[in-house]
Amino acid sequence: MAKLIVYVLRLGHREVRDKRVTTHLFLAARAFGADRVIYSGRRDEKLGESIEKIVETWGGVFEIEYQKDWRKTVKDWKSQDGEVIHLTMYGLPIQEVIAAIRQSHRDRLVVVGGAKVHGDVFELADWNVSVTSQPHSEISALCIFLHELFKGKELARTFENAEKRIVPQAKGKKVMRRKSGKFRPN
C-alpha cells in the first residue's frame, strides 16, 4: 500500500501578528508526520527560509507552499479524491471520529484556522473535528490530531539526511553531527 499523504493548510496567515505561531505550527506539522504545509493569507518569504534551515539541519523531506486562494486549494484537493479535515472546537470530538478517519485510504488535507475562519470551511470539509470543545491553540489541536491519526508511530520517526541528531539522555544534552557521512559526537 502506498504511503498516505498528509498536508496541513494554515488559513489566514498574518505576517507580523502570526509569525511565531505559524512557524511553530509548521515545525509541529513536520515533527508529527505531515509531508507539507500550505498557507494562505499574507505571503511571507521568511517563513519558508526558516523552515528550510530546520529541514537542512534536522533532516527529512518537508515542503512549504503559499497559496493565495485557500478555497481553490481545498476544492482542488477534493477534486483529486483527497479528504479535508478541519480542526475546530465546534466539530465532532476526535475520540468519536478518529477510527473512521484512519480507515479512509484517501490523502488528507488538515485545515487549521488563523484569525476568524470563514463559514465555507465548515461546509467544504469532509470532517469538522474538535480536540476538546474548548478554546486552545491550533498548534496543540494539530499535534494531538496527528498523534491520534498516526497512533503515536510518528514519535519514533527517523528523519533522513539530517546534519544533527539528538541522542536521548536522562540528564544533559547530547547531539551528534554528521561528519564524512557518519554521525559523531558534537
Regions found by a protein language model. Give the residues of each.
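Long, contiguous hydrophobic alpha-helical segments, chiefly transmembrane helices and signal peptides
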Residues: 22-25, 34, 39, 111-112, ...
